């Protein structure tokens, strides 16, 4: 379990428990997912994100409450609407799962358990802890998820093993505190940052994800990975500039100094008293050293500016 604070989680109240799923042209699978999910929750909510097929009609016939976007707003945009509806309905807990059949609705009780017994505010169905896994998950995708998770964890300090799992559950407390701006898949990381900032307790439970579904992810692995990794690196650079800029800068400065020393040691004195110096290594040392100094100073300045801004916010507004 990853804990942002030792503050106890909210205990169970009287609100409904809802399973919700973004919906975008999933007419082949949404019906079975809704019917399975209904067995474990009080209500199933589908957010139709501009589908052009019969997804919304099928979801309604299977008993789901359907809300629709007039045009596609992206995964994060769909989640924003789901969160808003859940807050309006004052739900006790909200489970998010995919409508394409990748997530097993029978795992819903396992995701809800840590929330309903007060152990967690936010639960992630993880493929990378004992008992979890991905049915024929490509190795390149595993590597990509682990790289993204590493960058995200360096920024949030939560230690989550599967930051990209879309199978998630939220307590009422989490729904009230989590706010996110991204409309794309980056919202998965933004939520974790919000958990760290708002002292919410995060827990992972094992789940198995299928990859042999009719359509699978709406995003290609490359575009998804690049977009989310870019967000993770930007977030990390904002929160830990000394690590992102200062450490590489110091390394480059040391490398430049080493190249420069080798260049000086290779100076040859000719028989006529003149000195021969290989210009190439000297120029390389200068360029590498200047780049290192620039990165190092950038990291130091951003680090100082971040801490100054935090002090000002704390002093004037009480915001940490």
Sequence positions of predicted segments:
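Hydrophobic helical membrane-anchoring modules
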Residues: 1-13, 157, 182-320
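Short hydrophobic beta-strand elements that form part
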Residues: 18-22, 45, 68
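Short loop->beta transition adjacent to catalytic acidic/histidine clusters or analogous donor-positioning motifs
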Residues: 14-17, 36-45, 54
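Acidic helix N-cap motif at the loop->helix transition within catalytic regions
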Residues: 28-32, 53-62
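A conserved acidic beta->alpha catalytic loop
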Residues: 48-56, 101
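N-proximal low-complexity "stem/linker" segments adjacent to membrane-targeting elements
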Residues: 1-36
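Acceptor/aglycone-binding surface of glycosyltransferases and processive sugar-polymer synthases
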Residues: 65-88, 93, 105-185, 211-228
